[in-house]
Amino acid sequence: MADDTDNPPNIQIPAKSYGFPPEAFDPRRLPDYDTNFLPAHDLEAFIQALAAPDFVQSPDDASSMRLNSPGLHSPSSLDITKDDYDHSEARAALASVADVAAPGGGNNHHRRTSTGTFFSAHNDWAPVSEKVIKTDRDEKRNKRGKDRKNKKPRKGVAPLRTLVGTRSKDETREGYLYSLLKWPFLLFVSFWIVGLGMAYLATRFYIYFYEQFVAWRGRREQLRRAMRATGNYKDWVAAARNMDDFFGNQRWKEENDFAYYDSKTVRRVWDQMRRCREKAEEVERELESQSQNSDSGVASGEETSNTKAGGGNNGNDKKTQPVEDLKALIEACVKNNFVGIENPRLYSQTYYGTKNLVQNYVDEVERSIKFLIDTKQLTKEQKRVMFKGICANYGRTALCLSGGATFAYYHFGVVKALLEVDYLPDIITGTSGGALVAALVATRTNDELKELLNPALAHKITACRESFTVWFWRWWKTGARFDSVDWAKQCAWWCHGSLTFREAYERTGRILNVSCVPSDPHSPTILCNYLTSPDCVIWSAVLASAAVPGILNPVVLMMKNRDGSLEPYSFGHKWKDGSLRTDIPIKSLNLHFNVNFSIVSQVNPHINLFFFSSRGSVGQPVTHRKGRGWRGGYLGSATEQYIKLDLTKWLRVLRQLELLPRPLGQDWSQLWLQTFGGTVTIWPKSIPSDFLKILSDPDPPRLARMIHEGQQSAFPKVKFIANRLKIERLVERGRRETRDRRNAANAFTATGDGEGSYASHSIVDAMGGKHPLAPSSSGGAGDRRGSIESILSEDDLRSLLIKGREGVHTSGGSSTGTEDELTMTELEGEDDDGGTSRVSEGGSRNRYFEGALEEEDGALEVAASDHSRT
């Protein structure tokens, strides 16, 4: 994280630079190195939000007393309270909170800081001042209750209860056997799990030595070292092809048959698609020749071309038949994992590439889609409907960055590898430490990222700079090692200031997602993005996603208002680390953005230890028996799988039988029982010293190694990702180019009765005060990837304005009313990204539209704006 200093840091160029040039270690070359993105008023708003009590988390705590009671803030009002002199500590705590939370904290010393206890009648008829005569029995009972209430706990008991954790009354099961057998059964299962863990480590050591001294020897070891020493993707591909030639994998590529996909169907579809495209290209050339040689000129030639494309003349039916067949074939075959062509095993038998038949099919689909985008034989409406259906069936791709403390810096290498070949997905999600990397990627353009992803970035990572004596006393007093305010100052640089999720989407076109877990163990997890929480400030979500119990206390999410000020989001509730429940939010991504192809970079240390692919993974085949064997032999792989499955079984037993306590008030069972992988899972190779430095800032040499290892782990997956993304981006291009781009400016002109003027102003107000046809003010590479002009047609906009005018007349409002008199109706429907539009909690109602209204089949649906790649 960022640490602003006036003196330039020392430049350290290690002996082993991992292919980085000397200037890559100079921090002064980093963009915005000395920029302080966090204004003082934003930081002050965050401090006040942290000081405010969380009523949901601790409604009965002394810190959650009302700050708006008449006796505290309204001296002029009728004071019907009395001082409670028995809670001096509570009054002092309340006074400190009030001083921090008040806007003019320095002028609040004269206010009353006593807590108020309101009088209440015994019933509806008894007066307030009625004298109540207490019996001796009541006095003794009240005295015993006060003594029990005022009894202080023994030293060490309260921290121990917090550390061990307890369940509430509603969560605790009843029964004598449960109470008697709970702890013995917990001890037995715990010892058994420890024994299984030791056996698993022994098995992994056996497999490691087997591969090092049996599988990798001689020439193959030299080729592997040469491949791991490469610093860019081009050199890696050359080294990977040498490995394939040595192991004879080329013969496997030439054979079409394979058990994990339908080779016969792929071959038939490929031949038919190629023939249809070639015939359609011949017809296209004939139409272009007729258009150029026409006696009536260019205009009549275009009209003739459009007439032929419409298929209205019987003489042209044969000419339009090839393109119709090609269109039908593309609609039927361009689907997610069609007949198994996206099976990871197709890319797990070689170091580079896949079956020649599969590669030919992918290349032919790419050429056919390009032809359908540019052809004149289909109308724009036909193309629009076609690409809309293909987009829904094919889905989208997302890059998921896991948590893992300082292990998360391996993500820099993964992002750098994908950025080098221009295959970085537009949808990015991060959790805990991965959220910090995802925020950096989603708030910077490609050109900025290429300058940032260097070892010099280590000079901005200073979150763990404090000495042991400093952070230990903070942990002893507050229960957290790090300070939330200090992390907010540093995190703002990584998030490019107080950008919201919507503003980051506008700046780079990338969709950032951050997982956050509420402090309440039973409340649902939230996935922050520009749809669910558009006005939420990114750096606050990153802090919340990194708030591991014991490391960082839960924090408040912040929301940006229309005037740029910050205030607490979601009623001031506090949130914490998202990896405790959903490290990889696959289901939420599919719900909001139709993601069905996930690239997961997994670096969690407690998960990385248990990763083992007995049959090889994408770009990393098994060397034993030419890819048809088992890693470590069959006995080693079978033992590893059995122990790992048995460990999972006993962890589920602990959770289902409610045997586990809740240390620090958190259910930790999900740490091992989640889904941690995706369609493609990248596992950067760590070293033992990373576990010792799990909460230590990396220096430039260490960060250079982590970036290099991240690249090396991502290079084998690039070919698989490339075959997926090049088709997906062509489909997005077809969607973008087939939308109606006619000028919608005339829809904003005022009509005679002034209704058009009012409707246009309401649209401008809904867009945050910016005209939809106004150019972007950011300029350069930072421009957003699309504009409302490119996604909103004239007819759609007129329909929108008519709906707005009808709403005004129905409510009886005037055409000259203010923006508060016109509320926007929530539109529910399927958007282009497969998600559902909704009014998010804490979002402003008068924001501009993120999608265009398309009227099709008599129904309105909200279409999210697609953006062209920067």
Curated annotation (Swiss-Prot):
It comes from the Eukaryota. The chain crosses the membrane at residues 183-203. Residues 142-155 have a biased composition (Basic residues). The lineage of its organism: Eukaryota, Fungi, Dikarya, Ascomycota, Pezizomycotina. GO terms for cellular component: membrane. Residues 818-834 have a biased composition (Acidic residues). The keyword Ligase does not apply. PANTHER family: NEUROPATHY TARGET ESTERASE/SWISS CHEESE D.MELANOGASTER, TRIACYLGLYCEROL LIPASE PTL2. Its EC number is 3.1.1.-. This is Patatin-like phospholipase domain-containing protein NCU11180. Residues 1-24, 131-158, 281-320, 735-786, 804-870 are annotated as: Disordered. Pfam families: DUF3336, Patatin. It is a single-pass membrane protein. It comes from Neurospora crassa (strain ATCC 24698 / 74-OR23-1A / CBS 708.71 / DSM 1257 / FGSC 987). InterPro entries: Acyl_Trfase/lysoPLipase (IPR016035), NTE (IPR050301), PNPLA_dom (IPR002641), Triacylglycerol_lipase_N (IPR021771). GO terms for biological process: lipid catabolic process; triglyceride metabolic process.
